[in-house]
């Protein structure tokens, strides 16, 4: 009886197959090669104010986050806002400045509210969907926050006028190299924020490129029109995560992750838009990261641990290891607790590492089960006395 089966009962027995091993009737691999390029960005004298902005925002976020955790349930909207701000400051100066200015206006107009965001919503909530409520989160100390925001906004304005963001030059260099080599290639740029999307669109159009954008605020008709435009007319497609959900973009083979999500599963979801059956070219993924950040340190340690697990499993995809139901909350907490405490990264990753190792153990134990033939009729009996737990355990013995 299928209705008797619930996720909690079958989760220990779920097996993620390694789809990159899939072959056609002739024994040919169905997936093309995936080549990942890490593009590490350094702040130099031209971007020293951007570095200062990162440090100031991170200090503000870390301090406020630790205070908000004292009453986590009441402060969930504020916690989400702080997460957004920390992500924005490494995305673009335009994005963080816009968000800070909106937050300041809310406080000055006293439009704050507690909000109804629950902790269990965090792993499902998309940034584009939740930012409006988060901006109006109740303040822990309104006068202090107003003063801090004014200082950060002032620095953001200076950084914005000092020079273009540090990530821009490497982005333009990569795109120039890719498209000068083969003008028929199509490039997809992923960002988490509409403000960054707009910023990049203006830069690339001014560079002479044809650009299509897609975000979660667009209607179905607008999304379809954007897809058709990119497929037939333009070279570059800039999408937010919300805009890119469910898209099949296998006619493109270049992805640039201008913003790296904290959750590796989200990176896999992006790559899956082009890295799928039917892709005719090798897939190239360019991951942009600012080197002198806590985010990069977390990424380094996390990838070290993941590489060990992936090697032991003989797979090369995060999605074959991580449980998407828990990954977002776990990784978000790791990053937020590490902001301002870089020396604690290893310690903060212990729970995540334990979860991954447990999934590895399960995968190794049950990997061959799907290749075995089982007589289900003998195992489950009749519908009236169907015992899910015992049936599954019998299958796995």
Q: Predicted regions span which residues?
A:
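Conserved Helicase C-terminal RecA-like lobe
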Residues: 29-46, 71-75, 84-90, 94-235, ...
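Short amphipathic alpha-helical segments and their helix-coil junctions
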Residues: 53-77
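C-terminal accessory region of SF2 helicases/translocases
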Residues: 281-397
């Amino acid at each position: 009886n299928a209705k008797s089966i619930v996720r909690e009962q079958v989760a220990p027995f779920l097996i993620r197959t390694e789809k990159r091993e899939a072959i056609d009737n002739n024994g040919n691999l169905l997936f093309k090669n995936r080549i990942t390029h890490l593009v590490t960005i350094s702040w130099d004298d031209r971007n020293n104010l951007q570095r200062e902005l990162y440090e100031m925002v991170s200090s503000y976020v870390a301090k406020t986050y630790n205070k908000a955790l004292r009453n986590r349930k009441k402060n969930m909207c504020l916690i989400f806002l702080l997460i957004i701000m920390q992500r924005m400051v490494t995305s673009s100066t335009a994005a963080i400045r816009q968000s800070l200015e909106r937050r300041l206006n809310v406080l000055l107009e006293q439009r704050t509210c507690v909000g109804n965001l629950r902790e269990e919503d965090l792993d499902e909530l998309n940034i584009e969907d939740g930012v409006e409520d988060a901006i109006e989160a109740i303040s822990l100390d309104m006068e202090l926050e107003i003063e801090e925001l004014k200082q950060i906004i002032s620095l953001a304005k200076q950084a914005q006028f000092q020079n273009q963001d540090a990530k821009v030059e490497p982005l333009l260099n990569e795109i120039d190299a890719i498209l000068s080599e083969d003008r028929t290639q199509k490039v997809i740029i992923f960002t988490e924020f509409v403000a960054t999307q707009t910023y990049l669109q203006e830069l690339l159009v001014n560079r002479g490129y044809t650009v299509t954008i897609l975000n979660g605020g667009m209607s179905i008709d607008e999304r379809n029109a954007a897809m058709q435009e990119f497929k037939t007319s333009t070279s570059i497609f800039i999408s937010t995560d919300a805009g890119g959900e469910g898209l099949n973009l296998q006619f493109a083979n270049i992805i640039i992750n201008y913003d790296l999500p904290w959750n590796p599963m989200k990176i896999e979801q992006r790559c899956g838009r082009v890295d799928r059956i039917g892709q005719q070219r090798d897939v190239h993924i360019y991951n942009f990261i600012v080197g002198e950040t806590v985010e990069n340190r977390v990424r380094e340690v996390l990838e070290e641990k993941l590489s060990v697990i992936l090697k032991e499993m003989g797979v090369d995809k995060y999605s074959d290891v991580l449980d998407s139901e828990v990954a977002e909350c776990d990784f978000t907490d790791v990053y937020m607790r590490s902001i301002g405490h870089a020396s604690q990264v290893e310690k903060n990753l212990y729970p995540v590492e334990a979860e991954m190792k447990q999934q590895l153990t399960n995968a190794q134990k049950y990997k061959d089960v799907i290749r075995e033939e089982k007589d289900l009729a003998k195992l489950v009996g009749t519908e009236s006395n169907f015992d899910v737990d015992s049936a599954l355990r019998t299958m796995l013995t």
